[in-house]
Amino acid sequence: MSLSALLNQLVELTGNISNAYTIALYKVDADKETLVLRHHISLSLNFDIDAKVKFGEGPIGNVAKSKKLFLVENFEKNPTKICIYKKNENLKSFLAIPVISNDLEGVLIIDSKESYSFPAKQQKIITGLANQMAWQLNQEKQYSKKDTPPQS
């Protein structure tokens, strides 16, 4: 299995265990200080696959800048403010986790249409999976600088 396929599988597994409405892994574009979509699964037809998030902008960008988890258990604000949906999706819970290897590699976001969807135990499991994603993203970045493809 390639590193790319393994990373996609980690994102999908995390979405499954968290009962996500949407799960999305954004990777860092350090030159532009933005986050770009790497992989996602969403039940929404309004998910914006072209959205780019600037560091420090909205909850996702703030996680990239602060490198600290962001959790809202009763999220009722308009999700267009988080720049991942083209229109309001009436979300109830939102979790954004920094994906860090040695440096910030990306941000993992998970949302739900249910309130209080991310208890402490689940956050711990998701954080562990995010750590694996960080390693995978770092490997992809290293190998993209070389001509030889990564070995699994």
Predicted regions and their residues:
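Signal-transducing coiled-coil/dimerization helices and immediately adjacent hinge/linker segments
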Residues: 3, 141-152
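Acidic/proline- and glycine-rich, intrinsically disordered low-complexity segments
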Residues: 46-69
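Signal-transducing coupling segments at domain and membrane junctions
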Residues: 45-46, 73-93, 112
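Sensory-domain boundary capping and coupling elements
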Residues: 60, 99-112, 136
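Allosteric cytosolic regulatory segments
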Residues: 127-135
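Amphipathic alpha-helical coiled-coil segments that mediate homodimerization
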Residues: 2-25, 59, 129
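GAF sensory/regulatory domain recognition
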Residues: 24-48
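A short, aliphatic-rich beta-strand micro-motif
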Residues: 92-100
